[in-house]
């Protein structure tokens, strides 16, 4: 009977555990299916296997060690019972009761330790696959890789063991206390005796050994000290704290020896005296000695003493942020611009950005969203060769936002089967404006109509920034494709994305994982059905590579007629010796509070590289992780861990590389650090004599920090135009411009940073000074005031500083928007040069007013791109053939082929309609 009861209890416990773990197990199963579908199964299994290995290992070690200490303590006190529950009905069972309590608590502690250990899989793998850096720290002469890849594991193991031994000590003390082995009546020397004293002494020895190891590692932590003149080890750290940590490590080891030797003594006098002496020496070495050194030796001679350590900080901070290769040039800022100079730089002038992304986004939404469930989330900036001209453009994908579907139409079928994708994009050149103040659109409408030599062959967007719901494709019901007059167009997904849901077992798993019974009972599923999840591209790439940090502003590129998302991925660390974390840098909070930088640089990040670009297909969801920095040791470590994840730099297609751009947020981070770290002289740095800052500008009516901006221009001493990202600098507490920085994005020059410094003795107007001159111009201020009084909202766009050869000019677009409207129109363009400030209807007129030169826009052949042109009879024959193929696929229940044929049929109908209208 007892055996039967035990079996029932055991089965019940197993079922309870299985039920509690079932959701986790099912989720792991669906995750495995997803990783297999996206061809990254090896990454999933590598991570999972190491997590399981560490979890099991930690649980077993913790449980065995803690239970062993409990067992030893109980055996050494087997002559006594636990002094609890006396005088109660449970008194006869108190030993069993306490044993169960200890078993449960030890199990819970072991589970907690295992759960806390399993996330360390990345730390272990980086340790095992570490790639050395090319340099060493200046204090211990250790490779930088030691601090980034090895020391974190050593310190983690030390903390892990300390917690383990300390927990064993506490459990043992509790057992002895409950057994009444600590008697207050004894002399303190005899508080512990015999085998109990031996047990406690050995555990104390283990604790003190680990404390000694901790002091040994603290020596290295001095390289990350933030309490001195600069980040990293200073004079006091090297000459006082370093000695103190050495001394305390030795003292802790001696204390461990004392604890072990006390085993042969019948009292605890030695360990007690040892602990007292240790505490006294700790205060002497760790507190008083460094304080004395700092106050009486360093402070009176701080610059002299700290100078070499300031130099270390400058050198290593520059290395960590990639600022050691900034090429510095002089920029004379001459006032020699004339019409001939502008003609010689037509590539720059014709690509001056007149459209600020903020009012342009409002314009896109008003003119091109078409339906309430479509949304333009952001405006991206890129460049294309259009009809032979290198053009900078702005573009945005039209995404599906299901939450904007009318509430009554928000059904399970519509959410997961019908409204599955966005459609198409809008593109305009940065510098062209129609007579009504609206942008000239190169690509527009639904289906996409192109006026240039760029075609959108696959406009459907299944994966994007707003695709936050899971969907099903390959169902027996059609998906909504796009709206058109009279009726909507429908389609069937024919791409490679999605996880097959072609069995009852898979439907059951996803129904349980997603808590959706409809997956089980819906009659729309077929043998070709697939589920698409992790469709948000930022979430999608993070699922594959959580060890990278991703830029929060993906952008689209039209490559071979397909919409591709490009995301910048960063490798970061907070363990680069002497490198100052971003959050500590001069006025860093100003940029950390703007945009996405705080997310990228969260924590104490003091090393960053943009080593990877990720491309995600908007239709299929396929991901490519391209290596763009082969010299990054952090990335090369991950490449050893996950060799199948990354695509080599040499294998990046040319048409993909043509759309890589220097990341805006990384540029901000580097520019922020350069505000202080352009100073290479330790004395200048100590005195903070030459601090810079980001300039300010006016947007609408508000002052704000100036944002870096992309520009196609010919850099000084360069032969041709290229796509660059630039930002001016001004001195702290002054408004004049002192320098400007450029980051190159094209070809072999990608990633190069250039700094152009103005002559110290020359006044070069900064952006805020130009804004003030605009405000002080009577004609301009009068016109702006007049518009405001007539009920229009005046929007002053970004002020752009445009370097041309060795001169500068300033451009600011002016937009008008009705107070109750959301459609901004570009009405004026302000150009400032030297002492002149002019505002006219167009950039061309403003330049002509100042320089006597008209800017001619590059000729663009306006041709609406549609499917291949055919004569009417050929089209009709093609339509009949496509219709026959559609019907044949429908009769065979081949819904994938049906979707392809029907889409082709509808495209041919549209082409026939346009050709008949044009005739």
From Swiss-Prot:
<dbReference type="GO" id="GO:0005576">
    <property type="term" value="C:extracellular region"/>
</dbReference>
<feature type="transmembrane region" description="Helical">
    <location>
        <begin position="96"/>
        <end position="116"/>
    </location>
</feature>
<keyword id="KW-0472">Membrane</keyword>
<feature type="transmembrane region" description="Helical">
    <location>
        <begin position="6"/>
        <end position="26"/>
    </location>
</feature>
<feature type="transmembrane region" description="Helical">
    <location>
        <begin position="52"/>
        <end position="72"/>
    </location>
</feature>
<feature type="transmembrane region" description="Helical">
    <location>
        <begin position="243"/>
        <end position="263"/>
    </location>
</feature>
<feature type="transmembrane region" description="Helical">
    <location>
        <begin position="160"/>
        <end position="180"/>
    </location>
</feature>
<keyword id="KW-1133">Transmembrane helix</keyword>
<dbReference type="Pfam" id="PF03699">
    <property type="entry name" value="UPF0182"/>
</dbReference>
<keyword id="KW-1003">Cell membrane</keyword>
<dbReference type="GO" id="GO:0005886">
    <property type="term" value="C:plasma membrane"/>
</dbReference>
<feature type="transmembrane region" description="Helical">
    <location>
        <begin position="268"/>
        <end position="288"/>
    </location>
</feature>
<protein>
    <recommendedName>
        <fullName>UPF0182 protein Tery_4385</fullName>
    </recommendedName>
</protein>
<feature type="transmembrane region" description="Helical">
    <location>
        <begin position="198"/>
        <end position="218"/>
    </location>
</feature>
<keyword id="KW-0812">Transmembrane</keyword>
<dbReference type="InterPro" id="IPR005372">
    <property type="entry name" value="UPF0182"/>
</dbReference>
<comment type="similarity">
    <text>Belongs to the UPF0182 family.</text>
</comment>
């Amino acid at each position: 009977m007892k055996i039967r009861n035990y079996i029932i209890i055991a089965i019940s416990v197993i079922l309870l555990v299985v039920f509690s773990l079932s959701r986790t197990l099912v989720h792991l199963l669906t995750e495995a299916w997803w990783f297999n579908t996206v061809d990254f199964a090896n990454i999933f299994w590598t991570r999972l296997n190491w997590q399981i290995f560490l979890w099991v290992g930690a649980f077993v070690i913790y449980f065995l060690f803690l239970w062993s200490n409990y067992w030893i303590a109980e055996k050494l006190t087997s002559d006594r019972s636990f002094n609890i529950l006396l005088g109660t009905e449970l008194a006869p069972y108190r030993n069993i009761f306490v044993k169960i309590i200890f078993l449960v608590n030890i199990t819970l502690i072991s589970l907690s330790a295992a759960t806390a250990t399993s996330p360390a899989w990345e730390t272990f793998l980086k340790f095992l696959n570490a790639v050395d850096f090319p340099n060493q720290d200046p204090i211990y002469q250790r490779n930088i890789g030691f601090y980034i890849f090895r020391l974190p594991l050593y310190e983690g193991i030390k903390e892990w063991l300390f917690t383990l031994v300390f927990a064993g000590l506490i459990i043992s003390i509790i057992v002895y206390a409950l057994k009444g082995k600590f008697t207050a009546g004894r002399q303190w020397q005899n508080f512990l005796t015999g085998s109990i004293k031996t047990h406690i002494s050995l555990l104390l020895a283990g604790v003190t050994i680990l404390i000694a190891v901790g002091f040994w590692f603290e020596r290295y932590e001095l390289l990350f000290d933030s309490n001195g003149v600069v980040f990293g080890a200073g004079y006091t750290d090297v000459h006082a704290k370093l000695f103190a940590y050495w001394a305390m490590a030795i003292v802790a080891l001696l204390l461990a020896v004392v604890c072990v030797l006390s085993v042969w003594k019948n009292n605890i006098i030695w360990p007690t005296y040892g602990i007292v002496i240790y505490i006294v020496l700790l205060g002497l070495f760790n507190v008083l000695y460094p304080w004395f050194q700092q106050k009486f030796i360093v402070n009176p001679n701080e610059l002299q003493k700290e100078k070499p350590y300031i130099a270390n900080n400058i050198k290593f901070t520059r290395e960590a942020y990639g600022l050691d290769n900034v090429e510095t040039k002089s920029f004379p800022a001459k006032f020699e611009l004339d019409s001939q100079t502008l003609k010689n730089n037509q590539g720059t002038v014709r690509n001056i950005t007149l459209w600020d992304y903020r009012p342009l986004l409002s314009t896109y939404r008003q003119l091109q969203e078409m339906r309430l469930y479509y949304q333009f989330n952001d405006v991206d900036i890129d460049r294309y060769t259009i009809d032979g001209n290198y053009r900078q453009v702005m573009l945005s994908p039209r995404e599906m936002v299901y939450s904007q579907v009318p509430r009554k139409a928000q059904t399970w079928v519509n959410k997961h089967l019908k409204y599955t994708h966005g459609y198409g994009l809008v593109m305009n050149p940065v510098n062209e404006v129609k007579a009504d103040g609206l942008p000239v659109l190169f690509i527009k409408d639904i289906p996409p109509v192109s006026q240039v030599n760029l075609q959108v062959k696959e406009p459907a967007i299944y994966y994007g920034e707003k695709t936050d719901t899971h969907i099903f494709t390959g169902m027996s019901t059609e998906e909504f494709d796009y709206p058109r007059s009279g009726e909507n167009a429908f389609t069937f997904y024919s791409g490679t994305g999605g996880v097959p849901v072609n069995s009852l077992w898979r439907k059951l798993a996803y129904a349980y994982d997603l808590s959706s019974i409809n997956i089980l009972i819906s009659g729309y599923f077929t043998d070709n059905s697939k589920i698409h999840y992790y469709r948000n591209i930022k979430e999608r790439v993070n699922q594959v590579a959580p060890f990278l940090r991703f830029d929060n502003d993906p952008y689209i590129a039209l490559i071979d007629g397909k919409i591709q998302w490009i995301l910048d991925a960063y490798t970061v660390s907070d363990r680069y010796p002497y490198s100052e974390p971003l959050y500590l840098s001069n006025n860093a909070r100003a940029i950390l509070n703007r945009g996405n930088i705080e997310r990228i640089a969260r924590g104490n990040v003091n090393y960053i590289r943009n080593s990877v670009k990720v491309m995600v297909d908007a239709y299929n969801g396929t991901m490519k992780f391209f290596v763009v920095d082969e010299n990054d040791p952090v990335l090369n470590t991950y490449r050893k861990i996950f060799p199948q994840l990354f695509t080599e730099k040499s294998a990046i297609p040319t048409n993909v590389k043509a759309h890589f751009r220097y990341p805006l947020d990384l540029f901000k981070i580097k520019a922020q650090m350069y505000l202080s770290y352009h100073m290479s002289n330790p004395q200048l740095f100590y005195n903070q004599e030459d601090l810079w800052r980001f300039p300010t500008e006016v947007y609408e009516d508000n002052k704000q920090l100036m944002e870096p901006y992309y520009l196609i221009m010919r850099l000084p001493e360069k032969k041709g135009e290229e796509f660059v990202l630039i930002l001016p600098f001004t001195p702290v507490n002054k408004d004049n411009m002192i320098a400007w920085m450029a980051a190159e994005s094209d070809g072999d020059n990608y990633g190069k940073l250039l700094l152009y410094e103005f002559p110290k003795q020359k006044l070069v107007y900064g952006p805020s000074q130009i804004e003030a001159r605009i405000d002080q111009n009577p004609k301009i201020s009068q016109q702006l005031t007049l518009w405001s009084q007539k009920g229009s909202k005046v929007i002053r766009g970004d002020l752009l500083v445009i370097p041309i050869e060795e001169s500068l000019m300033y451009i600011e677009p002016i937009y008008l928007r009705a107070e109750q409207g959301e459609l901004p129109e570009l009405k004026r363009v302000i150009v400032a040069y030297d002492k002149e400030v002019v505002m006219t209807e167009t950039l061309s007129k403003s330049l002509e007013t100042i320089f006597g030169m008209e800017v001619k826009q590059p000729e663009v052949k306006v041709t609406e791109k549609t499917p291949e042109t055919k004569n009417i009879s050929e089209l009709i024959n093609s339509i009949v053939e496509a219709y026959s193929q559609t019907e044949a696929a429908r009769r065979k229940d081949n819904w994938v082929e049906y979707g392809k044929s029907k889409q082709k049929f509808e495209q041919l109908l549209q082409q026939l309609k346009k050709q008949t209208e044009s005739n």
